[in-house]
């Protein structure tokens, strides 16, 4: 998905841990996002099912994927998921507002916030604000986030033992000679 959506997807995943799968539960809680002006134009358009690229560029769909699937990786952008009635309804119901405070931060930081109504009709919100996404160079836990994404992307393709070898090589690349790495990559 578009790099500008990553902090929003991370925020949705955090809120999902607190409130559950809001797409499946469909309990009527409002979900809102604050975007810098540039992102309201780039990714804040109304969601309509379409191409994979359309889904990847849609802030609303990417956040929906974060709430429903806990990720916004290639498996979340299949034609079936992009046009799934629950996904479409949830994405279309997300409210987007321009947050001028974010204009001064983005794009130096890929920031953003998502909030969930704490109870249906309460008009009270629980906001998750992130200055940067989990994979950002500004995140002190970047390596952990990148390794988790690597494993998630390849879990159905490469056996866990081989993924662990690759991860170890990459995380220790500064301490390894090139010929050692080549030998290790002969999985």
Region annotations inferred by a language model:
Residues 1-187:
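Terminal-appendage/accessory-domain detector
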